[in-house]
Regions:
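Generic beta-sheet signal
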Residues: 69-71
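Conserved mixed alpha/beta catalytic, RNA-binding, or beta-rich assembly cores of soluble enzyme
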Residues: 158-160
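Short glycine-rich anion-binding loops that position phosphate/pyrophosphate groups of nucleotides
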Residues: 50-53, 74-76, 162-164
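Short acidic/histidine-rich motifs immediately flanking catalytic phosphotransfer sites
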Residues: 40-46
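Short, structured active-site "lid" loops
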Residues: 47-61
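Catalytic phosphate-donor-binding core of small-molecule kinases
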Residues: 2-39, 77-156, 165-267
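Proline-centered loop/turn at the N-terminus of a beta-strand
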Residues: 65-67
Length: 267
């Protein structure tokens, strides 16, 4: 019998609800305390659904320190290692310690407005900076203390290695092995004309290097999106983006291989 506390989240879909209930019954039969809310004493988070549900759970729990495991009832499922048909097998492996913890790095953006206020955002997959709908955005970019370019286009995407297979990949970014602690900067529909010159491919930065973004003075509205959570800003003075010290602890079962999953999902 166990005295551990486990929190189960699901995405509300019928299969996810059934799988969550089945998992709850199996865990309670083994003595676990199971609930549908996160508290500081939670020992494990089980997220049932797809990658979107996983990201929402991470943000809902404010990037928790406890391990989290994904049960895949969605489509892509890069964060999920457990199938609904293998719940008993997972519980046995969890109890016997037959798993690894994968540390997933996060990306952080600090937005400073002209009135001096600072706002911090974290992303497990990515953070994007865009302008108003259907408008190009013009951003001065510096890496470290070095000015690099004035970007013009739909926006910029800052991806972690774990997030490199998500939105980043769909806009032409590179797939990065999650064991690499890097920040990938990918342009979204960059302009490349005689009037505007921008990088048209991704840039990879080491984790200890920050990137600065300054919107042009005429840009009166910026949209920052972290993992699908959008925040509009007016009067932005600057934005600092870098790899965060916060990480997510994802359970990976024995036999997990990132590149095998890439092959299964994309090829």
């Amino acid at each position: 019998m166990s005295n551990k506390t486990i929190t189960i989240f699901h995405n509300g879909e019928e299969l996810s609800e059934k799988t969550s209930l089945c998992m709850k019954e199996k865990l309670e039969a083994r003595g676990y305390l199971v609930r549908d809310r996160f508290d500081d004493d939670t020992d494990l988070i089980v997220c049932v659904g797809g990658d979107g549900a996983f990201l929402r759970a991470i943000h809902r729990c404010d990037f928790p320190n406890c391990p989290i495991v994904g049960v895949n009832t969605g489509h892509l499922g890069f964060f999920q290692d457990v199938l609904p048909s293998a719940l008993d097998q997972f519980i046995e492996q969890y109890e016997s310690g037959e798993y690894n913890l994968q540390e997933l790095n996060t990306v952080r953006a600090i937005v400073t407005t002209v009135d001096g206020h600072k706002h911090t955002h974290l992303g497990l997959n990515e953070i994007t900076i865009k302008g108003r709908r259907s408008y190009s955005v013009h951003l001065s970019i510096s890496i470290g203390d070095q000015y690099i370019e004035k970007f013009s286009g739909d926006g910029l995407l800052f991806a972690t290695s774990a997030g490199s297979t998500a939105y980043n990949y769909s806009v032409g970014g590179s797939i990065a092995d999650p064991r690499l602690n890097v920040l990938q900067v990918t342009p979204i529909a960059p302009m490349n004309t005689t009037a505007y010159r921008s990088f048209t491919s991704s840039i990879l930065l080491p984790a200890d290097l920050s990137l600065g973004v300054i919107p042009e003075s005429r840009e009166n509205r910026i949209y920052l999106n972290n993992d699908g959570f959008e925040t509009p800003y007016n009067n932005v003075k600057s934005i600092e983006v870098r790899v965060s010290n916060t990480s997510v602890h994802l359970i990976r079962l024995k036999g997990y291989d990132f590149w095998s999953k890439v092959k299964d999902k994309f090829l």
